[in-house]
Amino acid sequence: MREHKLVVPYTGKERRVRVLLPKNYEKDTDRTYPVVYFHDGQNVFYSKESYVGHSWKIIPAIKRNPDISRMIVVAIDNDGLGRMNEYAAWKFQESNIPGQQFGGKGVEYAEFVMEVVKPFIDENYRTKSDRKHTAMVGSSLGGNITQFIGLEYQDQIGCLGVFSSANWLHQEAFDRYIERKKLLPDQRIFIYVGTEEADDTDKTLMAGNIKQAYIDSSLRYYHDLIAGG
């Protein structure tokens, strides 16, 4: 695994970006690879780093599934306390914290990913940089920003993995946004949500049925995609 520190233009600070290379990358020097970009990079590889206490366990998952196409995995760290702002393109409509407003930095974060991180990866690694071979994955708020970037940069991202979307935080704004977008029908999207979603942070942001809110957000996203073609 390789580690890079890339400067985020709107903060001027460095952000850790880790790259997991496929087996025999150094030997197969003529081969190029598809790329999967993950948000919440601290959650991708090791549970001890995860802010939720458990990770995606990408490395053992790849080892257990040798038939999966070899790929380059890019894990982009979140901004810690700034995560709720960066992973939402709109201000939250839901919040039980008086005087606090979250969200609204998603457009700038998307530009960092697509104009700084992706070009860096394509320049420094043997990637298949085209849309067909570029994917993006995120969960919860990471799922929100995956949805947004996937729509805003449809011409560059061909596959999305959206897990436990938290669009209920800015549902109306997202619905208006997707209604205005012309959707490309060949973009592949995997949507997943469980029936026991939510954590302590969610409970500070919404007083209602949070578990159902996650389910409803995923269903609305699915129906919006169908309606949009």
Give the label of every model feature segment.
Residues 1-229:
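Non-catalytic cap/lid and distal C-terminal segments of serine-dependent acyl enzymes
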